[in-house]
Amino acid sequence: MKRNILLITFCFLTALAFGQDKQLTILHTNDTHSQIYPLSPNLADTMKADRGGFVRRIAMLKEERAKNPDLLLFDSGDFSQGSPYYTMFKGDVEVGLMNQMHYDAATIGNHEFDFGLDNMVRLFKKANFPIVCANYDFKGTELAKLVKPYIILKRNGLKIGVFGLAPKLDGLVVKANYGPIVYNDPVVCAQKVINELKAKKCDLIICISHLGWNIEGVSDEEVIAGTRGLDLVLGGHSHTYLTKLEYVKDLDGKMVGEDQNGKHAIYVGKLVLDMKKKK
């Protein structure tokens, strides 16, 4: 099986609720864009040729979970749009396969709106994983009951807060497809959620973002630079291939890491966090 994991290991200092050091493994995808099968083996770009595909990812995840049952799996949005499967079945294939992968959470990309709100409601009800987005106001839609601003997960004795951020819809999505949904400032919303998660004594706070890296509009860099208390961003939207974590200084001067895996799930990001208790 061709491996499709980018592995990044880094040490993370935190005020752990327990005395001993901890380790946490995170796998993540973004902008898979309905890439059901591997890319063509005949592509000139050998870094992409014959990579990806849901069957491979499902098999790889089984292997990874056999080694580490406590791992976390996240998606940063735009699992929709990009193949005839999505055009014909409007997301049923993609969500069905994601269910087999047992995601812990996903956020919303702009292409999730491509068939309108009713289709999003149908798909999110089908998903066996939570959808998180903190900066959209879903008031007046059925999505208000289906999308949470954040979730709190527990792994290996750690309390992990996870929230989502999504891009401005105007100019990306036809107005009829998002209707009354209101986009709010991601920086303001992020800080509000971070404060709530800190108050709930989370050991680690992760943002799964579809804002984009080094992109026009509010980007992941701006969210990190304009907030305090965030620990890690798993990005999407800009289709950026990061071979190592990129760091941005937050309001307290702490360097916060960002990771992103390009598109089509050619790579699955793997982060191994060594959680060290602050002295």
Describe each model-derived feature in a short phrase.
Residues M1-D21:
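Bacterial Sec-dependent N-terminal signal peptides
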Residues G19-K279:
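Acidic, metal/ion-coordinating pockets
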